[in-house]
Amino acid sequence: MLKSNNTSEATTRKVGDKTAKKVFFRRRKGCPLSVPNAPVIDYKNPELLIKFVSEGGRMLPSRITNVCAKKQRKLNNAIKIARILALLPFVFQAK
């Protein structure tokens, strides 16, 4: 039987002769649209909606914008409605 000592390997990794420190992950910030005094998600507010659209015109995912799932669905629907009503372009111009 092979015995392995994984307890010391889990805490630190050896890189060459030096030992690397533990990797700490950044704490995710909360939803920017769920804080008090946050702007209301509405298709009639293209200034807000354009912040959640990429340069190519695609909707940004919630892992990039840090928006919660409920607000992400509202954002997606508002962006789609704004595009249909010609408040937002479907495709942005390449510069």
Curated annotation (Swiss-Prot):
Keyword vocabulary terms for this entry: Ribonucleoprotein, Ribosomal protein, RNA-binding, rRNA-binding
Any coiled-coil regions, as ranges: none
GO molecular function: small ribosomal subunit rRNA binding; structural constituent of ribosome
KW DNA-binding (keyword) present: no
Source domain of life: Bacteria
Keyword Zinc-finger: no
Gene Ontology biological process terms, A to Z: translation
A Pfam family matched in the record: Ribosomal_S18
Family affiliation: Belongs to the bacterial ribosomal protein bS18 family.
Record's function text: Binds as a heterodimer with protein bS6 to the central domain of the 16S rRNA, where it helps stabilize the platform of the 30S subunit.
Name of the featured protein: Small ribosomal subunit protein bS18
Originating species: Rickettsia canadensis (strain McKiel)
